[in-house]
Amino acid sequence: AEEYLNRRKYMGTSKWFTEESGFPIEVCGKQKEFFDATSRYRQVQFRASNRSSKTVSGAYAVSCWTTGIYPDWWGGRKFDCPTTGIAAGQTGQTTRDTVQKELLGDLGKFGTGMIPKERILKVQPKGQPPGAMDYMLVANDWGEPSKILFKSYDQKLVAVSGLACHWAWEDEEPPYLFHNEVFARLTTTEQLGSVLINTVTPLNGLTPFLLNFEKQSDLLGSAIRTV
């Protein structure tokens, strides 16, 4: 049993939304709706309270899009090529402690997050804050590795300008201009099905960003899922 539990730590997405996890996808309706919506909309926002697996769900989707490993029940966006994407949080520290942690695992325990250990080809340290990664390369079945670029909102627009991405994940509410610039990074890959996801707990109520997301949802092809 101990050997199984130790091996299970490195099983990536297989740790989640399964019978063995205690939370099979059949009882996680809103999470399933969130995943499914990525196949129909270019922007999908998952509004949820704290401790409701919104960040876990964001990391799960990113793992699928970078490794090409999809569960049988997956009804969301699929890519059939190596992908490049932005994974961003509010600050360098929060990106390290949430987004990076969910994808890679704790510092010193990389491979225990959503990206399976055997799929991690390279992690490039950023320097500051300590333990933060600049990017990681992920093995898939298409040849060239996928690339995850770790960014933060406090880096301003220069951090993401000029990039061409297949997907983007914003964890928590971004500054509106940062969000627009990230979305613009998806235009060159639109024909491949590029998609942006935003996982957020609306601690400050209906801010201008959240209201504008609702207002433009029909125009931009967006969806909101709330838990």
Residue ranges: model-predicted function:
Residues 1-227:
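Phosphate/NTP-binding elements of NTP-utilizing enzymes
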